[in-house]
Amino acid sequence: RCLNLEAYGEMMRIPFYEIRYLDVHQNYVTVHAKADYTVKRTLGDFEKELDDRFCRVGRAMILNLKYIQRVTKTEVRLSDGTVLPLPRGAYEPLNRAIIQHA
């Protein structure tokens, strides 16, 4: 499956397996894959398109569960070395999602 994106004046298809995470800043969402793509859409729009390998974490981030290497109460480490802050209250739901997806 692929995510269809219109960014930088062109239409792109990004395979789900390439997407590590998505995060939001103001009114823009950045899709972090092999390259980063920033588009003016809501995180909720993406959440509807993505499948169960993705988990929304708080208001500002969606993670691809297969890239998660380690989770603590305050941060998530991805397999590429990226460390992301974990919002308060997100630890338990994220752990449940990881267990269900395994």
Predicted features by range, described:
Residues 1-79, 83-85:
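Conserved binding/recognition cores within well-folded domains
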Residues 1-9, 90-102:
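Eukaryotic intrinsically disordered, low-complexity regulatory linkers and tails enriched in Ser/Thr/Pro
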